[in-house]
Amino acid sequence: MNFGYFCNTTNWNKKSYTQLLEEAREIAIYCDQNNWNSIWFTEHHFNHEGMESCTNPLMMCTDAAARTNQIRLGQACNVITFHNPIRLAEDIATLDQMSKGRVEVGIGRGVYGREAVHMNKEADLKDQALSLIHI
């Protein structure tokens, strides 16, 4: 059995962004040192409710890769409709090389209305982008 930690950086207590990032780092290091299998970072934008503060799971994984040794690094998920698919594929591949093969990839089209206002259009964009990436 594998255990992973879903690190959805939230800010219910109105902490500084620097403090939130430091806490995420500490969680990644703790999980690595205590033999967790993976840590997953999410992508949400615009902080609509005033609490979600994780806008770039690849950057979070890159930071965690530099501070850990064995834990797998996942994105849950990269919102494909916000990214150039070629650039996203290159960024994922670079992170995989930098982390010595520890990357887990999650791709989605967004879940909240502000992330996927036109769900049918977003689904088409997601399908087109995935055909370009072809992971």
Spans of model-derived segments:
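Flexible, glycine-rich active-site loops centered on histidine and acidic residues
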Residues: 2-19, 81-132
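N-terminal beta1-alpha1-beta2 module of alpha/beta enzyme domains
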Residues: 1-67, 71, 134
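Hydrophobic residues within beta-strands of alpha/beta enzymes
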Residues: 39, 73, 103-105
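A sequence-composition feature that detects small, non-aromatic residues
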Residues: 24-28, 38, 64-66, 76, ...
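Structural motif
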Residues: 42, 76, 106-108
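Conserved strand-turn element in the central/C-terminal portion of the radical SAM core barrel
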Residues: 74-82
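Short, charge-rich binding segments
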Residues: 65-72, 94-100
